[in-house]
Amino acid sequence: MSQKWVQTQAWLGFPDVPISQEDKPDEYSTFLGGFPVFFDGCSLNPNIIKCGNCKNLCRLLLQCYAPLEGDNLKERALYVWGCHNPSCRRVPNSIVCVRGVRLPLKSDIEAVKSPKAISHLEEKKSSPKEKKVNPFAITSESSRGLNPFSDATSANNPFSLSTDVNPSKPSSNVFSKPSFAAKAQQSITDQQKTQAKTKTKHIALTTSGMSVHPPVTETYTYPVTEAFQGMFLGLDLEYVPQNKVNSKKDDFSTFKNYTPYLNDSSEAWEKESYEKSPSVYEKTFRLFSEKISHNPTQCLRYERGGTPLLASGRDKLGQQLKSVTNFGKSPVPLCPLCKSPRLFEMQLMPHAISILNDEIAEWSTILVATCSMDCNPPINKDRVGYAVEWVGIQWD
Protein backbone atom coordinates (compact mmCIF):
# COMPACT_ATOMS: atom_id res chain seq x y z
CA MET A 1 0.00 0.00 0.00
CA SER A 2 1.39 3.38 -1.01
CA GLN A 3 2.13 5.97 1.65
CA LYS A 4 -0.48 8.73 1.99
CA TRP A 5 0.74 12.28 2.47
CA VAL A 6 -1.20 15.08 4.13
CA GLN A 7 -0.79 18.82 3.65
CA THR A 8 0.05 20.90 6.74
CA GLN A 9 -0.35 24.64 7.27
CA ALA A 10 3.36 25.38 6.90
CA TRP A 11 5.13 26.66 3.80
CA LEU A 12 8.64 25.40 3.10
CA GLY A 13 11.44 27.13 1.24
CA PHE A 14 13.70 24.90 -0.87
CA PRO A 15 16.88 25.75 -2.81
CA ASP A 16 15.97 26.73 -6.35
CA VAL A 17 18.60 28.40 -8.52
CA PRO A 18 21.75 30.33 -7.59
CA ILE A 19 21.71 34.11 -7.71
CA SER A 20 23.81 35.33 -10.62
CA GLN A 21 24.42 38.34 -12.83
CA GLU A 22 21.84 36.94 -15.22
CA ASP A 23 19.29 36.11 -12.54
CA LYS A 24 19.20 38.77 -9.85
CA PRO A 25 16.64 39.05 -7.04
CA ASP A 26 14.29 41.98 -6.56
CA GLU A 27 12.36 43.24 -3.54
CA TYR A 28 9.67 40.62 -4.16
CA SER A 29 12.10 37.70 -4.03
CA THR A 30 12.79 35.19 -1.29
CA PHE A 31 16.40 34.06 -1.13
CA LEU A 32 19.35 33.07 1.02
CA GLY A 33 22.64 34.98 1.15
CA GLY A 34 23.76 37.67 -1.27
CA PHE A 35 22.74 41.26 -0.62
CA PRO A 36 19.32 42.62 0.40
CA VAL A 37 17.09 44.31 -2.14
CA PHE A 38 15.16 46.99 -0.28
CA PHE A 39 11.86 48.58 -1.28
CA ASP A 40 12.57 51.53 -3.57
CA GLY A 41 16.27 51.01 -2.84
CA CYS A 42 15.82 52.63 0.59
CA SER A 43 18.44 51.11 2.86
CA LEU A 44 17.93 50.74 6.58
CA ASN A 45 20.32 52.24 9.10
CA PRO A 46 23.43 49.99 8.95
CA ASN A 47 23.83 50.31 12.72
CA ILE A 48 20.77 48.08 13.08
CA ILE A 49 22.57 45.11 11.55
CA LYS A 50 25.71 45.27 13.65
CA CYS A 51 26.46 42.24 15.80
CA GLY A 52 25.48 42.86 19.40
CA ASN A 53 28.70 41.21 20.53
CA CYS A 54 31.59 42.31 18.28
CA LYS A 55 29.81 45.31 16.69
CA ASN A 56 30.85 44.21 13.20
CA LEU A 57 28.34 44.33 10.35
CA CYS A 58 26.44 41.10 9.87
CA ARG A 59 25.93 39.19 6.63
CA LEU A 60 22.53 38.63 5.10
CA LEU A 61 21.17 35.14 5.76
CA LEU A 62 17.66 35.48 4.36
CA GLN A 63 15.32 37.90 2.63
CA CYS A 64 11.70 36.77 2.62
CA TYR A 65 8.96 38.67 0.80
CA ALA A 66 6.05 38.31 3.22
CA PRO A 67 2.91 40.35 2.43
CA LEU A 68 0.01 39.77 4.81
CA GLU A 69 -3.33 38.42 3.73
CA GLY A 70 -5.97 41.09 3.27
CA ASP A 71 -3.54 43.99 2.88
CA ASN A 72 -3.04 44.29 -0.86
CA LEU A 73 -1.33 47.68 -0.87
CA LYS A 74 1.14 47.40 1.99
CA GLU A 75 4.31 45.60 0.95
CA ARG A 76 6.31 43.70 3.52
CA ALA A 77 9.54 41.72 3.78
CA LEU A 78 11.61 40.07 6.50
CA TYR A 79 15.40 40.23 6.52
CA VAL A 80 17.68 38.11 8.72
CA TRP A 81 21.37 38.89 9.24
CA GLY A 82 24.01 36.86 11.09
CA CYS A 83 27.51 37.61 12.36
CA HIS A 84 30.32 35.65 10.71
CA ASN A 85 32.86 36.20 13.47
CA PRO A 86 33.92 32.81 14.92
CA SER A 87 33.85 34.24 18.45
CA CYS A 88 30.17 35.15 18.00
CA ARG A 89 28.96 31.79 16.71
CA ARG A 90 27.00 31.04 19.91
CA VAL A 91 26.09 34.55 21.01
CA PRO A 92 22.30 35.19 21.10
CA ASN A 93 22.52 38.79 19.84
CA SER A 94 24.63 37.83 16.83
CA ILE A 95 21.48 37.34 14.73
CA VAL A 96 19.22 40.24 13.71
CA CYS A 97 15.79 40.20 12.06
CA VAL A 98 14.25 43.32 10.54
CA ARG A 99 10.72 43.77 9.20
CA GLY A 100 10.61 46.14 6.26
CA VAL A 101 7.43 47.74 4.92
CA ARG A 102 6.40 50.07 2.13
CA LEU A 103 3.12 51.82 2.87
CA PRO A 104 0.71 52.91 0.13
CA LEU A 105 0.75 56.49 -1.07
CA LYS A 106 -2.23 58.68 -0.27
CA SER A 107 -3.07 58.67 -3.96
CA ASP A 108 -3.22 54.86 -3.88
CA ILE A 109 -5.54 54.93 -0.86
CA GLU A 110 -7.83 57.47 -2.55
CA ALA A 111 -7.77 55.43 -5.73
CA VAL A 112 -9.46 52.46 -4.08
CA LYS A 113 -12.68 54.46 -3.82
CA SER A 114 -13.16 53.91 -7.54
CA PRO A 115 -13.60 50.36 -8.94
CA LYS A 116 -11.89 51.43 -12.17
CA ALA A 117 -9.02 52.91 -10.21
CA ILE A 118 -8.69 49.68 -8.24
CA SER A 119 -8.29 47.70 -11.45
CA HIS A 120 -5.76 50.17 -12.81
CA LEU A 121 -3.83 50.24 -9.54
CA GLU A 122 -3.61 46.46 -9.33
CA GLU A 123 -2.41 46.25 -12.93
CA LYS A 124 0.20 48.93 -12.30
CA LYS A 125 1.38 47.23 -9.12
CA SER A 126 1.57 43.76 -10.63
CA SER A 127 3.25 44.73 -13.89
CA PRO A 128 6.83 45.00 -12.53
CA LYS A 129 6.60 41.50 -11.05
CA GLU A 130 5.39 40.07 -14.33
CA LYS A 131 8.40 41.28 -16.29
CA LYS A 132 10.32 38.19 -15.21
CA VAL A 133 9.24 34.78 -14.02
CA ASN A 134 8.89 34.50 -10.26
CA PRO A 135 11.28 31.69 -9.20
CA PHE A 136 9.13 31.08 -6.14
CA ALA A 137 5.88 30.27 -7.94
CA ILE A 138 4.50 27.17 -6.26
CA THR A 139 4.05 24.22 -8.56
CA SER A 140 1.74 22.16 -6.35
CA GLU A 141 -1.89 21.64 -7.24
CA SER A 142 -2.96 23.95 -4.45
CA SER A 143 -1.10 26.94 -5.85
CA ARG A 144 -2.69 29.72 -7.84
CA GLY A 145 -0.81 32.62 -9.34
CA LEU A 146 2.75 33.78 -8.82
CA ASN A 147 2.35 35.02 -5.27
CA PRO A 148 1.94 31.98 -2.99
CA PHE A 149 0.67 34.23 -0.21
CA SER A 150 -2.01 36.06 -2.19
CA ASP A 151 -5.26 36.19 -0.23
CA ALA A 152 -7.33 36.52 -3.35
CA THR A 153 -5.93 33.46 -5.06
CA SER A 154 -5.49 30.81 -2.43
CA ALA A 155 -7.36 29.72 0.64
CA ASN A 156 -4.14 28.12 1.85
CA ASN A 157 -2.45 31.40 2.66
CA PRO A 158 0.04 30.72 5.49
CA PHE A 159 -0.38 34.29 6.68
CA SER A 160 -3.89 33.45 7.78
CA LEU A 161 -4.30 31.78 11.17
CA SER A 162 -6.92 29.49 9.75
CA THR A 163 -5.55 28.00 6.57
CA ASP A 164 -6.66 24.38 6.73
CA VAL A 165 -8.66 23.48 3.65
CA ASN A 166 -9.75 20.25 5.31
CA PRO A 167 -11.88 21.05 8.40
CA SER A 168 -11.84 17.41 9.46
CA LYS A 169 -8.06 17.35 9.75
CA PRO A 170 -6.82 17.80 13.34
CA SER A 171 -4.95 21.00 14.11
CA SER A 172 -1.18 20.71 14.17
CA ASN A 173 -0.99 23.20 17.04
CA VAL A 174 -0.13 21.74 20.44
CA PHE A 175 -2.47 24.26 22.08
CA SER A 176 -6.12 23.52 21.52
CA LYS A 177 -7.30 27.00 22.56
CA PRO A 178 -6.23 30.26 20.93
CA SER A 179 -3.96 32.68 22.73
CA PHE A 180 -4.43 36.41 23.16
CA ALA A 181 -2.12 37.06 20.23
CA ALA A 182 -3.94 34.56 18.05
CA LYS A 183 -7.29 36.03 19.03
CA ALA A 184 -6.07 39.51 18.19
CA GLN A 185 -4.83 38.42 14.78
CA GLN A 186 -7.98 36.40 14.11
CA SER A 187 -10.08 39.42 15.09
CA ILE A 188 -8.30 41.50 12.49
CA THR A 189 -8.84 38.75 9.91
CA ASP A 190 -12.56 38.58 10.73
CA GLN A 191 -12.92 42.35 10.47
CA GLN A 192 -11.16 42.34 7.14
CA LYS A 193 -13.58 39.74 5.82
CA THR A 194 -16.64 41.66 6.96
CA GLN A 195 -15.34 45.00 5.72
CA ALA A 196 -14.00 43.72 2.42
CA LYS A 197 -17.22 44.84 0.72
CA THR A 198 -15.70 48.25 0.19
CA LYS A 199 -12.04 48.89 -0.43
CA THR A 200 -12.30 52.20 1.41
CA LYS A 201 -13.23 50.47 4.66
CA HIS A 202 -10.47 47.93 4.16
CA ILE A 203 -7.84 50.62 3.84
CA ALA A 204 -9.22 52.40 6.91
CA LEU A 205 -8.89 49.17 8.85
CA THR A 206 -5.28 48.60 7.95
CA THR A 207 -4.14 52.18 8.51
CA SER A 208 -6.23 53.44 11.43
CA GLY A 209 -5.35 52.80 15.04
CA MET A 210 -1.63 52.55 14.28
CA SER A 211 0.90 54.54 16.26
CA VAL A 212 2.22 57.52 14.31
CA HIS A 213 5.98 57.95 14.56
CA PRO A 214 8.14 60.90 13.52
CA PRO A 215 9.22 60.51 9.88
CA VAL A 216 12.69 59.27 9.05
CA THR A 217 14.57 62.16 7.47
CA GLU A 218 17.99 60.58 7.09
CA THR A 219 19.00 58.49 4.11
CA TYR A 220 21.37 55.56 4.38
CA THR A 221 23.62 53.61 2.07
CA TYR A 222 23.88 49.88 2.56
CA PRO A 223 27.53 49.09 3.32
CA VAL A 224 29.68 47.05 0.97
CA THR A 225 30.37 43.91 2.99
CA GLU A 226 31.30 40.32 2.40
CA ALA A 227 28.34 38.12 1.58
CA PHE A 228 27.33 34.49 1.56
CA GLN A 229 26.64 32.86 -1.78
CA GLY A 230 23.11 33.62 -2.91
CA MET A 231 20.35 31.11 -3.62
CA PHE A 232 16.73 31.69 -4.57
CA LEU A 233 14.19 29.73 -2.55
CA GLY A 234 11.19 28.05 -4.13
CA LEU A 235 8.12 27.85 -1.88
CA ASP A 236 5.77 24.92 -1.49
CA LEU A 237 3.33 23.61 1.07
CA GLU A 238 4.58 21.02 3.53
CA TYR A 239 3.40 17.43 3.21
CA VAL A 240 3.95 14.75 5.85
CA PRO A 241 2.95 11.07 6.05
CA GLN A 242 -0.65 10.72 7.15
CA ASN A 243 0.27 8.52 10.11
CA LYS A 244 2.37 11.38 11.52
CA VAL A 245 -0.41 13.97 11.56
CA ASN A 246 -1.83 12.85 14.89
CA SER A 247 1.50 12.17 16.56
CA LYS A 248 1.80 13.96 19.89
CA LYS A 249 4.14 16.94 19.91
CA ASP A 250 6.53 17.96 22.64
CA ASP A 251 7.44 21.31 21.18
CA PHE A 252 6.06 24.48 22.70
CA SER A 253 4.46 27.62 21.37
CA THR A 254 5.63 30.52 23.48
CA PHE A 255 4.06 32.87 21.00
CA LYS A 256 0.61 31.39 21.61
CA ASN A 257 0.71 31.52 25.43
CA TYR A 258 -0.35 34.98 26.45
CA THR A 259 -3.39 33.46 28.17
CA PRO A 260 -3.55 30.48 30.54
CA TYR A 261 -5.23 28.27 27.95
CA LEU A 262 -3.31 25.02 28.02
CA ASN A 263 -4.12 21.57 26.75
CA ASP A 264 -3.49 18.32 28.54
CA SER A 265 0.03 17.98 27.18
CA SER A 266 1.17 20.90 29.34
CA GLU A 267 0.29 19.06 32.55
CA ALA A 268 3.22 16.74 32.04
CA TRP A 269 5.58 19.67 32.36
CA GLU A 270 4.42 20.19 35.95
CA LYS A 271 5.76 16.79 36.95
CA GLU A 272 9.29 16.87 38.26
CA SER A 273 10.09 13.45 36.85
CA TYR A 274 9.13 14.64 33.38
CA GLU A 275 11.20 17.79 33.75
CA LYS A 276 14.36 15.90 34.72
CA SER A 277 14.03 13.08 32.23
CA PRO A 278 16.73 13.26 29.51
CA SER A 279 14.62 11.03 27.28
CA VAL A 280 12.01 13.79 27.08
CA TYR A 281 14.57 16.30 25.86
CA GLU A 282 15.86 13.77 23.36
CA LYS A 283 12.32 13.26 22.13
CA THR A 284 12.07 16.95 21.29
CA PHE A 285 15.12 16.62 19.06
CA ARG A 286 13.84 13.36 17.59
CA LEU A 287 10.59 15.05 16.62
CA PHE A 288 12.59 17.90 15.09
CA SER A 289 14.74 15.47 13.09
CA GLU A 290 11.77 13.39 12.04
CA LYS A 291 9.86 16.40 10.74
CA ILE A 292 12.89 17.52 8.74
CA SER A 293 13.44 14.03 7.33
CA HIS A 294 10.20 14.25 5.35
CA ASN A 295 11.58 17.31 3.49
CA PRO A 296 15.35 17.23 4.17
CA THR A 297 16.30 20.11 1.87
CA GLN A 298 13.99 22.65 3.50
CA CYS A 299 15.81 25.84 4.42
CA LEU A 300 12.84 27.86 5.60
CA ARG A 301 9.61 27.09 7.46
CA TYR A 302 6.91 29.76 7.29
CA GLU A 303 3.67 29.67 9.27
CA ARG A 304 2.64 33.02 10.70
CA GLY A 305 0.67 32.45 13.89
CA GLY A 306 1.66 28.79 13.90
CA THR A 307 3.86 26.71 16.19
CA PRO A 308 7.66 26.74 15.92
CA LEU A 309 9.48 23.46 15.47
CA LEU A 310 11.96 23.32 18.36
CA ALA A 311 15.29 21.53 18.08
CA SER A 312 15.70 21.11 21.84
CA GLY A 313 13.80 21.32 25.10
CA ARG A 314 16.79 21.65 27.39
CA ASP A 315 18.76 24.61 26.04
CA LYS A 316 18.12 28.09 27.41
CA LEU A 317 15.42 28.95 24.89
CA GLY A 318 13.72 25.57 25.25
CA GLN A 319 13.69 25.96 29.03
CA GLN A 320 12.21 29.44 28.72
CA LEU A 321 9.48 28.17 26.46
CA LYS A 322 8.77 25.38 28.92
CA SER A 323 8.52 27.86 31.79
CA VAL A 324 5.86 29.81 29.88
CA THR A 325 3.60 26.74 29.85
CA ASN A 326 3.94 26.85 33.65
CA PHE A 327 3.00 30.56 33.73
CA GLY A 328 6.58 31.76 33.67
CA LYS A 329 7.78 34.92 31.97
CA SER A 330 7.83 34.79 28.19
CA PRO A 331 11.24 35.24 26.53
CA VAL A 332 9.47 36.99 23.65
CA PRO A 333 9.10 40.72 24.45
CA LEU A 334 6.18 42.80 23.27
CA CYS A 335 6.55 44.87 20.13
CA PRO A 336 8.44 48.01 21.26
CA LEU A 337 6.52 50.18 18.79
CA CYS A 338 2.92 49.34 19.69
CA LYS A 339 3.24 47.07 22.77
CA SER A 340 1.34 44.24 21.07
CA PRO A 341 2.33 40.58 21.57
CA ARG A 342 4.47 38.97 18.93
CA LEU A 343 3.53 35.97 16.80
CA PHE A 344 5.78 33.21 15.57
CA GLU A 345 6.24 33.74 11.83
CA MET A 346 9.10 31.70 10.43
CA GLN A 347 12.32 29.82 11.14
CA LEU A 348 15.54 29.04 9.32
CA MET A 349 16.42 25.36 9.12
CA PRO A 350 19.82 23.59 9.28
CA HIS A 351 20.09 22.91 5.54
CA ALA A 352 20.35 26.67 4.98
CA ILE A 353 23.84 26.53 6.49
CA SER A 354 25.00 24.21 3.71
CA ILE A 355 23.43 26.35 1.01
CA LEU A 356 25.05 29.48 2.44
CA ASN A 357 28.35 27.60 2.68
CA ASP A 358 28.71 29.01 6.17
CA GLU A 359 31.59 27.22 7.89
CA ILE A 360 31.15 29.21 11.11
CA ALA A 361 27.47 28.70 11.95
CA GLU A 362 26.50 26.08 14.52
CA TRP A 363 22.81 26.83 15.02
CA SER A 364 20.08 24.23 14.66
CA THR A 365 17.27 26.68 13.98
CA ILE A 366 16.61 30.42 14.06
CA LEU A 367 13.10 31.39 15.17
CA VAL A 368 11.50 34.71 14.21
CA ALA A 369 8.49 36.30 15.93
CA THR A 370 6.94 39.53 14.64
CA CYS A 371 4.40 42.09 15.81
CA SER A 372 0.96 40.45 15.85
CA MET A 373 -0.63 43.72 14.69
CA ASP A 374 2.02 44.30 12.03
CA CYS A 375 2.26 47.91 13.17
CA ASN A 376 3.79 50.60 11.01
CA PRO A 377 7.38 51.59 11.85
CA PRO A 378 8.72 55.12 11.28
CA ILE A 379 8.83 55.74 7.52
CA ASN A 380 10.84 57.96 5.19
CA LYS A 381 9.66 60.18 2.33
CA ASP A 382 9.23 57.09 0.15
CA ARG A 383 6.99 55.56 2.85
CA VAL A 384 9.52 52.81 3.56
CA GLY A 385 10.32 51.86 7.15
CA TYR A 386 12.00 49.19 9.24
CA ALA A 387 11.37 47.56 12.62
CA VAL A 388 13.63 45.15 14.50
CA GLU A 389 11.83 41.93 15.43
CA TRP A 390 12.54 39.10 17.88
CA VAL A 391 14.95 36.28 17.12
CA GLY A 392 15.42 33.06 19.10
CA ILE A 393 18.37 30.76 18.38
CA GLN A 394 18.90 27.10 19.20
CA TRP A 395 22.38 25.66 18.69
CA ASP A 396 23.61 22.15 17.98
Swiss-Prot record:
Key words, A-Z: Cytoplasm, Nucleus, rRNA processing
GO CC term (a single one): nucleus
Record-level GO BP terms: maturation of SSU-rRNA
Protein origin, superkingdom: Eukaryota
Cell compartments where the protein resides: Cytoplasm; Nucleus, Nucleolus
TM region positions: none
Function description: Required for processing of the 20S pre-rRNA at site D to generate mature 18S rRNA.
Similarity comment: family membership: Belongs to the TSR4 family.
Protein name, as recorded: Probable 20S rRNA accumulation protein 4
Species in which this protein is naturally found: Schizosaccharomyces pombe (strain 972 / ATCC 24843)
